[in-house]
Design a protein with these regions (language model features):
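Switch I (effector-binding) loop of TRAFAC-class P-loop GTPase G-domains
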Residues: 1-22, 33-46
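Conserved C-terminal guanine-recognition region of P-loop GTPase G domains, centered on the G4
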Residues: 21-22, 45-118
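Active-site-proximal beta-strand elements of phosphoester/diester hydrolases
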Residues: 24-30
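Flexible beta-alpha connector loops of hexameric P-loop NTPases
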Residues: 30-40, 62-71
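Active-site glycine-centered loops adjacent to acidic/histidine catalytic or metal-binding residues
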Residues: 28, 96, 123
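Canonical P-loop GTPase G-domain recognition
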Residues: 99-152
Length: 155
């Protein structure tokens, strides 16, 4: 068996933040793959290569799944990202649906999946961790859009 999300990219754009500065473009790529024919894996990698210029890469993991399923998916995704030479400093792992698990499981998930990137646990149903995720996005946007005082050119 294998997993793949068959939907195409989804793009959302927020023109300005609350301070009226900048904006955020979010590209939601296809989902996880495993045990696929080579040509489909190559197509998936090609899709991911388009994301390499992103300021941030958020890897979402459904924390309500079985740990072994999460481990396999995470490991395969990390192998592909490593093969594509993704800058690890841009990578953040987002554990979703944490309202569906005992929050004490979060540390166990991080350990068992051997997650080496920053982790943010969120729940879209309860709002848990959403402020932290928004802060990460806005801080990264602010840093990228900050003007260099000496040249008045964006960094």
């Amino acid at each position: 068996s294998f997993w793949i999300t068959t939907r195409s990219f989804k793009v959302r754009h927020n023109n300005k933040n609350k301070e009226g500065e900048g904006g955020i473009l979010i590209v939601d790529t296809v989902g996880f793959i495993s045990r696929l024919p080579t040509y489909m894996i190559d197509a998936f990698k090609s899709t991911l290569e388009e994301s390499l210029g992103a300021d941030l890469i958020l890897l979402l993991i459904d924390s309500a799944e079985k740990i072994e399923d999460m481990r396999i998916k995470y490991s395969n995704c990390m192998d592909i990202l490593e093969e594509l030479n993704v800058d690890k400093s841009k990578l953040f792992t987002i554990l979703t649906k944490v309202d569906k698990i005992d929050t004490r499981m979060i540390n166990e998930i991080v350990e068992k999946l051997e997650i080496n990137s920053d982790v943010i646990a969120i729940s879209s149903d309860t709002g848990y961790g959403i402020h932290k995720l928004k802060t990460l996005l806005m801080r990264k946007q602010f840093l990228e859009n900050k003007y260099n005082e000496n040249t008045n050119v964006k960094k």
